[in-house]
Amino acid sequence: MPQVDPELFDRGQFQAELALKSSPIAAFKKAIRQFREVLDNRFNSGRDIRRLIEDRAWCVDQILQQAWQRFDWGDDADIALVAVGGYGRGELHPYSDVDLLILLDSEDQESFREPIEGFLTLLWDIGLEVGQSVRSVQQCAEEARADLTVITTLMECRTICGPDSLRQRMLRVTGSAHMWPSKEFFLAKRHEQQRRHAKYNDTEYNLEPNVKGSPGGLRDIQTILWMARRQFGSLNLHALVREGFLVESECSMLASSQEFLWRVRYALHMLAGRAEDRLLFDHQRSIARLFGYEDNDVKLAVERFMQKYYRVVMAISELNDLIIQHFEEVILPCEQPVQIQPLNSRFQLRDGYIEVTHPNVFKRTPFALLEIFVLMAQHPEIKGVRADTIRLLRDSRHLIDDEFRHDIRNTSLFIELFKSSQGIHRNLRRMNRYGILGRYLPEFGHIIGQMQHDLFHIYTVDAHTLNLIKHLRKLNRPEMAEKYPLASKIIDRLPKPELIYIAGLYHDIAKGRGGDHSELGAVDAEAFCQSHQLPLWDTQLVSWLVQNHLVMSTTAQRKDLSDPQVIFDFAQLVGDQTHLDYLYVLTVADINATNPTLWNSWRASLLRQLYTETKRALRRGLENPVDREEQIRQTQTAALDQLVRNGIDQDDAEQLWSQLGDDYFLRHTAGDVAWHTEAILQHPDDGTPLVLIKETTQREFESGSQIFIYAADQHDFFAVTVAAMDQLNLSIQDARIITSTSQFTLDTYIVLDADGDSIGNNPERIAEIREGLIDALKNPDDYPTIIQRRVPRQLKHFAFAPQVTISTDALRQVSVLEVIAPDRPGLLARIGGIFLDFDLSVQNAKIATLGERVEDVFYITDARNQPLADPDLCKRLQAALVEQLSQDNGRDTLPTRINF
């Protein structure tokens, strides 16, 4: 800390200003305002961050000393003002806690009550927010003994005013000889860190990480120092070098990482104007600019900044693991005789932890850099890696070069890991943590720490990739069969499970390069398989899976699975049952690893339907596609059987059906046809819309709720319906719209509640929805077409230009309008309003929300029930949609595309 810095605080000038005024408050406030402005300016000009946070603590010291001296504490008073916690370390960020301990010799506070109250009131009046406690030395001891947080806080303290002897006494009575011996303290702190990491999902890669508390954050560095201080009395990172727990290069890396996070935290506080340790989307772009990052053709500035952040915290996590493992070996020595169990000439187990048999193992036999992970997969009882061996792994990474990568011993070992019966994910994570995986596979090294700046992908590319492999492994567990019944069954019968893991490792390997990552990744996957001597069939399968890893999900969510042509086209792409099995399992794992909230019963049912229908098509043979007329006859016959049993006249049913057209029977099950028909025939002819609601029984819509609406067709039917559903907090997943020759509309919507669950059999909720829809459809002119609701905070930071594409489906005689746009409340109602303005009818719709973006497909016709054929009309429609969907967006529009 500086001895004196007049630009920050000029004691003489401050005293002079105090003397001129009757109240000290203005002078104190001016001094605080001045040093804050100076320090912020120094930060913006790039001054050393360590000096800045120490200078801020020094400035607060000066303010507190001046405030303390204004009160009469008596001669030789046994009272001291002590800085504790981060402030006690002499580190303060702009809005960090200023934690103070007013330390007394005895519990009798009465003689100091008045000056203490006056002192704290003055601090409040001048705007210095502090956290304070008033304790005697004995009270400190009692509370520290009972509370890990208290003892940790008191370990870092310094006297600001008053006799330092009180603090020294307090340190003696709270020392490890009296409480919290180093072993007990280490175990408690390690458990505390584990709980804290669990709070952040045990990953450094959260979308909005906490720079202080998340894994790899500042708290992880401080935890190491607290443990060291309790055991060795060491106070800083350099002391750990002297004690042999760090080497100089590791110490330098930790110090530079700490300084980077300090700069991020300082910027966060400055931008937020308050104590803010979460790296929120609100601030990520601003800090990226502040740190000098700029967008380029491949990556946004914010993505480059966050990749730097993630790589820094991953490095901290790696060293945190190493040092804590080292501490464990020193602080928790085994009370039993050391157990040595040889594994081979290169490795042995020492009390359950694997270690090298001599320090030159990796130098003499470089293949051991991979062998150690294979051994851990083969011996799941191994607890971990000993600290010295972790350091040797880190120090030997340079041995992995092109010659190493093409050595058949190494390629064989790497493939052997994928063939292990267990431990694949765990040891790939270890390889990544210790820097081996990215070194062995340089293409993987490029995606380490690479974020995708959206809400759909909540992990970095490398974390997502390893999570995918974790989910693949979970599918093998018996307890997962209930949640993933089909995937669990399929993965057990895959002929070569190692191929799905390799495909998983490579499926996103080309992210961030520009271009189609699926195609680029397929090339990388093929090269990997060839260099690892995989047979031709295996190589082609892995490459095909990488190239097509998105196709099944896209087909299930964006195409009409009741259309036989959709199933036929997908079956043609897949080609055989083996490819279908591998692709289905990979897709399930990919969705789960992308974002846990994406996997719900709705998406599960869509994928299951696509898998089942494709399996039938493959069994039937691609040369024998479904006969549409036969499918219609089967549906009508089965529906008629149900209706006749329920007392419905066959002629009445067939008369109604004659008005509906083929699409209706292709897009509904026999059960739903019977349900609709019976309700329509029994519905009074009084102009009131018929609204039916039930849990859907269709396989592709399992776990959704089906809303069927039958009413006289009207110009604004779709717009009013979707606006009403939006106001009823319903999320539309699918829309099937049929207009009869008698100008009645038969609309089927598959919906979920806004929270993603089905409506269920809640009579009150069903009545609310039915009444709301009937009222809206009976009074369309009174109904608001767009619901104005607040845009959630996170969505605001992922605005992008809407894309609108129009093409023609000649077979179905409809125009296909695809919309990709930022998700916003009332978005479907906005789109429906545009359709209304252009006199368009919606025949079908597929709705998909992916994080902050929607990818919706509408099958539309014009007023004559024909596809859109006028290019000028299409351009005006696109322009209107883009303008409407760009509101509150703030981004330029992207080029749109029209195909006829």
UniProtKB/Swiss-Prot annotation:
Catalysis: reaction(s): [protein-PII]-L-tyrosine + UTP = [protein-PII]-uridylyl-L-tyrosine + diphosphate; [protein-PII]-uridylyl-L-tyrosine + H2O = [protein-PII]-L-tyrosine + UMP + H(+)
Lineage top rank: taxon: Bacteria
GO BP terms: regulation of nitrogen utilization
Cystine bridges: none
EC number(s) reported in the record: 2.7.7.59, 3.1.4.-
Cofactor: Mg(2+)
Stated regulation of activity: Uridylyltransferase (UTase) activity is inhibited by glutamine, while glutamine activates uridylyl-removing (UR) activity.
Region Uridylyltransferase: start-end pairs: 1-342
Signal peptide: none
Function: Modifies, by uridylylation and deuridylylation, the PII regulatory proteins (GlnB and homologs), in response to the nitrogen status of the cell that GlnD senses through the glutamine level. Under low glutamine levels, catalyzes the conversion of the PII proteins and UTP to PII-UMP and PPi, while under higher glutamine levels, GlnD hydrolyzes PII-UMP to PII and UMP (deuridylylation). Thus, controls uridylylation state and activity of the PII proteins, and plays an important role in the regulation of nitrogen assimilation and metabolism.
Record-stated family: Belongs to the GlnD family.
UniProt comment concerning the protein's domains: Has four distinct domains: an N-terminal nucleotidyltransferase (NT) domain responsible for UTase activity, a central HD domain that encodes UR activity, and two C-terminal ACT domains that seem to have a role in glutamine sensing.
Family annotation (HAMAP family): PII_uridylyl_transf
Protein name listed in UniProt: Bifunctional uridylyltransferase/uridylyl-removing enzyme
Source organism of this protein record: Pseudomonas aeruginosa (strain LESB58)
Source lineage: Bacteria, Pseudomonadati, Pseudomonadota, Gammaproteobacteria, Pseudomonadales
Name of the coding gene: glnD
